[in-house]
């Protein structure tokens, strides 16, 4: 598929998405596959989570528009997905959902170096973040925290 047709396809899919309060945040066309694979990543314009139903409801009109456009004259597989969960914890909902999960906490040190602590998310308050590091609870003031991310627990 040439760049011009890819741009036309992207514009077509964005129109379908906009009509459903969605936006395209990723389009990957794998022409080296047989059949061609069209991967579309969507998100809601209002920031709400994407459900499986949202993906399914976008699939049919997207497929219909691709067929009507005649931009592809070969068989293809259409895959619709969401961005998934971000590794970085930012909202109150994230902290409640992932309590007990392994996290990396990036700290800003006084000497301008970054220190990373690894433990289980224990508690978040207005003033501090608490993580469980090998059975000991460490309270970290939020003014020292740069970033909190989900991870795999290290020994």
Swiss-Prot record:
Highest taxon of source: Bacteria
Gene Ontology cellular component? cytosol
Q: Which SUPFAM superfamilies match?
A: YhbC-like, C-terminal domain, YhbC-like, N-terminal domain
A GO BP annotation: translation
Q: Does the keyword Chloroplast apply?
A: no
Ordered alphabetically, the record's keywords are:
Cytoplasm, Ribosome biogenesis
Q: Which InterPro entries match?
A: Ribosome_maturation_RimP (IPR003728), RimP_C_sf (IPR036847), RimP_N (IPR028989), RimP_N_sf (IPR035956)
Q: Which residues form the signal peptide?
A: none
Q: Where in the cell is it found?
A: Cytoplasm
Q: Which HAMAP family match?
A: RimP (MF_01077)
Similarity annotation = Belongs to the RimP family.
What is the annotated role of this protein in its UniProt record? Required for maturation of 30S ribosomal subunits.
What name has this protein been given in UniProt? Ribosome maturation factor RimP
Origin species, per record, is Prochlorococcus marinus (strain AS9601)
Task: Identify the gene encoding this protein.
Answer: rimP
């Amino acid at each position: 598929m040439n760049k011009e047709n890819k741009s036309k396809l992207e514009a077509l899919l964005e129109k379908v998405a906009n009509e459903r309060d969605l936006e395209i945040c990723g389009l990957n066309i794998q022409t080296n596959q047989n059949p061609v694979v069209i991967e579309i990543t969507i998100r809601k314009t209002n920031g709400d989570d994407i459900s499986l139903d949202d993906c399914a409801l976008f699939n049919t009109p997207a497929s219909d528009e691709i067929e009507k456009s005649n931009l592809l004259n070969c068989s293809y597989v259409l895959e619709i997905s969401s961005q998934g969960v971000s590794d970085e914890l930012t909202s109150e909902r994230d902290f409640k959902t992932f309590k007990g999960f392994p996290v990396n906490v990036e700290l800003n040190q006084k000497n301008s170096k970054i220190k990373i602590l690894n433990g289980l998310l224990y508690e978040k308050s207005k003033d501090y973040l608490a993580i469980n590091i090998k059975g000991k609870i460490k309270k970290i003031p939020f003014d020292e925290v740069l970033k909190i991310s989900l991870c795999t627990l290290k020994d």
